[in-house]
Amino acid sequence: MARDLIGPALPPGFKARGTAEDEERDPSPVAGPALPPNYKSSSSDSSDSDEDSSSLYEEGNQESEEDDSGPTARKQRKNQDDDDDDDDGFFGPALPPGFKKQDDSPPRPIIGPALPPGFIKSTQKSDKGRDDPGQQETDSSEDEDIIGPMPAKGPVNYNVTTEFEKRAQRMKEKLTKGDDDSSKPIVRESWMTELPPEMKDFGLGPRTFKRRADDTSGDRSIWTDTPADRERKAKETQEARKSSSKKDEEHILSGRDKRLAEQVSSYNESKRSESLMDIHHKKLKSKAAEDKNKPQERIPFDRDKDLKVNRFDEAQKKALIKKSRELNTRFSHGKGNMFL
């Protein structure tokens, strides 16, 4: 409002000089580039209040005009307002018609496998949670209250008769399969009948070089052999012995070797005396025959004889004699080509 003046009024055609406050309210013309449309200059609170009052006055006039023009004018005004909202914050030339306007921040290209259909990115989920945090809290509280399996979402088709029929069919299949399986022999798996592989000493073995190249362990199959396996192995050993004896018999002496052997034996009998071993055996046999014929008498106790201390038993004695007899085979001539 203009201040009430005291004194004579100015004649018509002359403009009254305003005060300092009026000069602040009325913006002076700006020298230089002006701001683009839809942008407001930073002004004081008084200018904001004046603009608010003027905008209210303009809105009232617009409403009155809309009432006068009818619904068509309202629709045009609404479309114009929407266009103004879309154009806010846009600088530069506008896109031609038919082109889609891009967002302010286009999404970055995804590096790696894409998400399957129906899944949402974590960023979108977080944005949704920020938009309505109240709804997110209610959803989480509802999920915490639920205990146990969720009810079925779709319709449940359950029939007692169909369930009984399915069960009977399963039992029938089981029985028929069992008859087929009974004819097959039951065989245990390999891990039940075989020993596991030998475990090496992880850092606990001897820290020396091997003395023998073929340092192999014995036959470990005796731990898992069944009676049938033992019988089969015994038969194999017997057959191997028979084959070795047959090979020895195959070395038949030739006629020349036989003739020379007879000549050597006749020469030894006529020219050479008996060996010490044969003489010793003859003495033992004669002594044993004399001891049998002697009458038995009471003998005083002899510790070495009666307790048989430091003496060979019969088994050791027979083994030693048998081993001594093999000296002739070890250091004698071969069975073939006896004579040069």
Swiss-Prot record:
Q: Which residues carry this modification: Phosphothreonine?
A: 138
Q: Name one Pfam family in it.
A: DUF3752
Q: Record keywords: Ubl conjugation included?
A: yes
Q: Where is the composition biased (Acidic residues)?
A: 60-69
Q: What phylogenetic lineage does the species belong to?
A: Eukaryota, Metazoa, Chordata, Craniata, Vertebrata
Where is region (Disordered) located?
1-304
Motif mapping: GPALPP motif 3: 92-97
Q: Which residues carry this modification: Phosphoserine?
A: 28, 105, 140-141
- Name the residue ranges with Basic and acidic residues bias: 124-133, 163-187, 227-261, 269-279, 287-304
Among PANTHER family, the record links this protein to: GPALPP MOTIFS-CONTAINING PROTEIN 1
Modified residue annotations for N-acetylalanine: 2
Composition bias, Pro residues: 107-116
Motif GPALPP motif 4 location, chain numbering: 112-117
Q: What is this protein called?
A: GPALPP motifs-containing protein 1
Keywords of this entry: Acetylation, Isopeptide bond, Phosphoprotein, Ubl conjugation
Gene designation per UniProt: GPALPP1
Q: Where is this motif: GPALPP motif 1?
A: 7-12
Record's keyword annotation contains Phosphoprotein: yes
Where exactly is the Glycyl lysine isopeptide (Lys-Gly) (interchain with G-Cter in SUMO2) cross-link placed along the chain? 271, 308
